[in-house]
A protein has these predicted regions:
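Short, low-complexity N-terminal intrinsically disordered segments enriched in polar/charged residues
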Residues: 1-28, 125-130
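Generic short beta-strand segments
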Residues: 79-85
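Hydrophobic pocket/interface hotspot
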Residues: 10, 22-23, 30, 43, ...
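Hydrophobic/aromatic beta-strand elements that line small-molecule binding cavities or substrate pockets
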Residues: 64-70, 82, 96-102
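Active-site neighborhoods of divalent-metal-dependent phosphate/nucleic-acid chemistry enzymes
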Residues: 86-88, 92
Length: 130
């Protein structure tokens, strides 16, 4: 297996909502695909925009941790743990997921996320009055 330290830096940029740092890991025509939502961002600018908006539209204290990263010359995979507070409702969330992708010449050409959005929706749903 290859060096996985770049995965730690990549995911640290997620937590920092540093869209430019996230996008810098991608080839100019790279793709971020959330298979479970589904949505797809193509190119560095749309990927950077997505990660810059996270703190202002969803959660200012969003945090990701990496587990079990693996990487070689042309692919990678890791598990992640996402925690934070959904700003609009004040509800905490705690989600696990996995990512994998394809690398070319040291840059991500296609990133895939897999997780359970229904779990997130249930955790951030506003409490109803009795």
């Amino acid at each position: 297996m290859g060096d996985t330290s770049w995965i730690e830096m990549f995911v640290a940029a997620w937590s920092a909502a540093d869209g430019d740092a996230v996008a810098a890991h991608f080839a100019p025509d790279g793709v971020w695909e959330d298979v479970t939502m589904p949505f797809r961002h193509e190119g560095r600018a749309p990927i950077a925009d997505m990660w810059t908006r996270v703190p202002t539209e969803f959660s200012a204290d969003s945090h990701f941790e990496v587990a079990n990263p693996v990487s070689d010359a042309d692919r990678y995979a890791f598990q992640w743990h996402w925690t934070g507070t959904h700003d609009p409702t004040g509800r905490r969330y705690d989600i696990r997921g996995a990512s994998m992708g394809v690398v070319r010449e040291g840059l991500i050409v296609h990133h895939y996320d897999y997780w359970n959005p229904a779990q997130l929706a249930a955790q951030i749903r506003p409490e109803t009055e009795s």
